[in-house]
Amino acid sequence: MFVLEALPALVLGVVVLFFLTDRPAKAKWLTDQERAWLENAMQDEERARAAKQSHSSAWRGLADIRVLALALVYFGTSAGLYTLGIWSPQIIRSFGASSLEIGFLNAFPAVIGVIAMILWARHSDRTKERSWHVIGACLLAAAGLIYAGNVSTLFTVMVALTLVTVGISASKPPLWSMPTLFLSGPAAAAGIAAINSIGNLGGFVGPMMIGVIREQTGSYSWGLYFVAGLLALSALVVMILSARANKSPTAELPHPHTH
């Protein structure tokens, strides 16, 4: 079983090794014209950012309050993601599903989530908007968790878990496009690393709190509400960042109509 689960990652690793290059100039699957256009576009973007920033050090990325704010946003989405991974099978089992049924049922929301993520990311790119795509996705996931805490049938809990999966999956692409809107170079590398490191702590806190709360209450409901609160907080933080960006002409954080 473990070998079968590892095979897709092994195959993908080989594909990435040969096809995912570090620069457009090395991408053999692009035409010469496409490589030249991408290189020029990246250089133009870098010059535009450099003109607005006196320096772009790693420390600048770590000290930027927007980085810490996005880390908090990612904390909430990570809490939701790992809650699904760890507790969804147990929640489904509590409605009387067999082990085989749990395997199939648990896979369904993930398939829908992948489709939603692709469509939502394309819509975000097409509209050149980031903030509300993250906000809407986080609120959908929060609503799904609240719904999951109040359902009484296997069908309704699957609907709830699908909503959560769709929301969390859809939030990722627009969220990860945000740091490079105001950081570049070493600052971007440090900032993204900080967001990832701090945010991933949510993957520990969310599932742990569900277990702790379930031991105290005998139910999953209040634990799910707790994680829903973290996702709602993520949405609120993005709202605040967007409002600040709209008020300040020099603030380069994702607000409506920013690419």
Predicted features by range, described:
Residues 179-189, 218:
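Paired intracellular helix-loop junctions of major facilitator superfamily
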Residues 92-93, 123-125, 209-218:
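Interfacial helix-cap and linker-helix signal at transmembrane-aqueous boundaries
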Residues 3, 75, 107-111, 193-201:
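Transmembrane alpha-helical cores of Major Facilitator Superfamily
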Residues 59-121, 172, 176, 206-207:
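Extracytoplasmic gate region of multi-pass secondary transporters
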Residues 30-50, 241-259:
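Intrinsic disorder in cytosolic terminal tails and internal cytosolic loops
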Residues 99-100, 185-195:
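Loop-to-transmembrane helix entry/capping segments in MFS-fold secondary transporters
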Residues 2-18, 224-239:
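Symmetry-related core transmembrane helices of the 12-TM Major Facilitator Superfamily/SLC fold
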Residues 128-178:
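C-terminal transmembrane helical hairpin of 12-TM major facilitator-type secondary transporters
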